[in-house]
Amino acid sequence: MTANPLPTIEEARSFLRSGRGGNVKVAVLDSGIETSHPLLRGLDLADDLAIVDLNFQIAAIPGEGRDVYGHGTAIAGIIRELAPEAEIGSFRVLGEHLRSRTLIIREGVRLALERGYHILNCSFGCGREDQVLFYKDWIDEAYTLGRHIVASCNNEDFMKREWPGHFPSVITVNFTDCTQAEVFFCRLGQLVEFAARGQDIEVAWTQGGRKKVTGSSFAAPHLSALLARILSRSPSLTPLQAKSLLHTLACPWP
């Protein structure tokens, strides 16, 4: 079997300009998505699930268009703005204080992979060394299935190890003060290789509101959306091929 050829850099730039995310499914593993928000008008979630612990048993229940914090709504708004034709699914794995458990996150990932999501946006990180292998299990599973993981990093020190961001197959994103939503940066030689807009940006928040935020959590969905644009025009890209292409398309990270 002959491998599908990689798009040329000129083709990839064209995909970034013209792609709208059609036929690409993006899973937002976060605090839920407020589907009634005015900035998300018309959004029909492909899935809306909350992963919860019911009497020591992890289960998925209806998310009911609810965000328990605001974080997930912000992520969804960024993705929808940049890739308006992408299908978005909400997998609520973070609680009211943006905390979670490894098993809850793992179940959210399992459901997203099972339901055919191409990109998993993970705007969270766990710095506990004793949890690394649990994260590695699903990162490896996603990689072997050809799915793309986009993650945030530690906001105070992007070199500080957090997972899933500190796995080489993951597209990990720091934030910059760049004001252009479609511009992103790359610096090789470290596991946090990418950076995108994420400082003092206005995003959708709970109760139909807006909020000015800063952090890598809000930079990551920029890359998720731009990757969705590319995949909508070149759907056979593997995670490593896509990451290599993003390296080439990115501006130098100063």
Where are these regions (language model features)?
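Active-site core segment of subtilase-fold serine proteases
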Residues: 1-86
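C-terminal subdomain of the subtilisin-like protease fold in secreted/lumenal serine endopeptidases
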Residues: 2-5, 10-13, 113, 117-122, ...
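Mature extracellular/periplasmic domains of secretome proteins
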Residues: 14-21, 81, 99-121, 131-147, ...
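Solvent-exposed loop/turn segments at secondary-structure junctions
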Residues: 33-34, 96, 125-129, 155-158, ...
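Subtilisin-like peptidase catalytic core
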Residues: 58-128, 233, 250
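Gly/Ser-rich catalytic serine loop of serine hydrolases
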Residues: 64-73, 156, 211-223
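A cross-family glycoside hydrolase active-site/sugar-binding cleft signature
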Residues: 92, 121-125, 150-154, 175, ...
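Extracellular S/T/G-rich loop segment that most often corresponds to the catalytic His/Ser-adjacent loop
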Residues: 162-232, 236
